[in-house]
């Protein structure tokens, strides 16, 4: 892990652990409905102040909390055009399989690459520390995966260029 990644991930972990103090809260508008307040935004008193944790200007996490849900949006580092394309394709692949990841949203928040929605039902069914570990592990692995894919693409491009230039 790089020197800047460890404090960044520990700050995200601590903030997520604090934000995941969720409780069941029925809708104030419709009887017998329970919707994530962070998505619905029906009343301001149920929403917490959003927290942004940045590693640099392009790599950041937005944690929006409410009384019964937390939305975690992640912007993955994209240093060049190849990383942008790889990140976009990889995130699209993940979001197409959102039903397999219970907390993954199909559509990310504007300005971010991927979003997770954790409701009070998720914290009742799963361990809170395991949810936090999943998000942190996802952030670690996505960085590694995109770096590995970029190396693979560059190696393949080098081989193709060498084969092409053999003809001249």
Curated annotation (Swiss-Prot):
InterPro entries: ARPC2/4, ARPC4. One of its GO terms (biological process) is Arp2/3 complex-mediated actin nucleation. The modification N-acetylthreonine is found at residue 2. Its main location: cytoplasm. GO terms for cellular component: Arp2/3 protein complex; cell projection; cytosol; nucleus; site of double-strand break. GO terms for molecular function: actin filament binding. SUPFAM superfamilies: Arp2/3 complex subunits. Pfam families: ARPC4. Keywords: Acetylation, Actin-binding, Cell projection, Cytoplasm, Cytoskeleton, Nucleus. It is found in: Cytoplasm, Cytoskeleton; Cell projection; Nucleus. Actin-binding component of the Arp2/3 complex, a multiprotein complex that mediates actin polymerization upon stimulation by nucleation-promoting factor (NPF). The Arp2/3 complex mediates the formation of branched actin networks in the cytoplasm, providing the force for cell motility. In addition to its role in the cytoplasmic cytoskeleton, the Arp2/3 complex also promotes actin polymerization in the nucleus, thereby regulating gene transcription and repair of damaged DNA. Component of the Arp2/3 complex composed of ACTR2/ARP2, ACTR3/ARP3, ARPC1B/p41-ARC, ARPC2/p34-ARC, ARPC3/p21-ARC, ARPC4/p20-ARC and ARPC5/p16-ARC. Belongs to the ARPC4 family. This is Actin-related protein 2/3 complex subunit 4. It comes from Bos taurus.
